[in-house]
């Protein structure tokens, strides 16, 4: 065991060790989330969590970290950048023949990577505090990570409900380490959104129903990742070519002009997932899907939902005979897929009959212009 440190020294060491482990920022807060409890309950009461039953099932436990690890006194909150080089946001979004995958999911699944780093951080603290009990969390337990990150000074909550940082925007993962030592806490930062509502107005489906409140049932990330059944028909045309997640509310945000590229090789895009041809993706067998998505966050939605999402994107593409052929080729595999294929075919035929060459989505066109002007490095 190393020489004991006083708590102020230990807090500084923890932040230093966190940076050495690859985190871009480390903050410390207490476990009091009592102010978040009524907001969480109101959100659940309005059914904004959709079919994510586990959110309601755990209830207020999410706002009580000390109940997850009895004796917890502090939460060490960390963030890690995930934006890859050559993100190709605009070039992918404006090409309806390509599939858009949320940029956090292009590389290796972040859960295990962050959890292992947090575990190492806990072990480093233990060298100076042998009686320490700790537990790492990365989307792996019912915990309100964003309010904790805000209290720990990592940023403020934007109107899209994500954490924003003045020097890094919002393209980063969050993680937590629960500890049972009374470390000095950090102070929250001043919010920086002001009267800006860009994220609310750009959302393709109007999922940000009021500042800081997202109705998951309308959110493309929820529809393409969490929803197990049929995607509501009225929302399908608004999804465009987004087949796994959506980044629009982040891309329009002025603070993401300061976004930082990741230094983690594991977050580099896998070629088959980066600006892929929709028709090629739709031809993947389940074996090919599992092979390409091994170690990826995408794998958990399964092959069926993957095809469902792509069918919607093909339905949103301009008329093309090869799209019709591709859609027809997968009929009869599963009722859920058949329903989305039938819708996509109807969309294609309607465009053919009306001689529609290009589908106009004003919000997407505006977003592409903003990206090309404000985020040229990542366009």
Swiss-Prot record:
It catalyses: epoxyqueuosine(34) in tRNA + AH2 = queuosine(34) in tRNA + A + H2O. It comes from Escherichia coli (strain K12). This is Epoxyqueuosine reductase. Its EC number is 1.17.99.6. It comes from the Bacteria. Residues 181-213 form the 4Fe-4S ferredoxin-type domain. Pathway: tRNA modification; tRNA-queuosine biosynthesis. The gene is queG. It is an enzyme of class 1 (oxidoreductase). Its cofactor is cob(II)alamin; [4Fe-4S] cluster. InterPro entries: 4Fe4S_Fe-S-bd, 4Fe4S_Fe_S_CS, QueG, QueG_DUF1730. Disruption phenotype: RNA from mutants accumulates epoxyqueuosine and lacks queuosine.
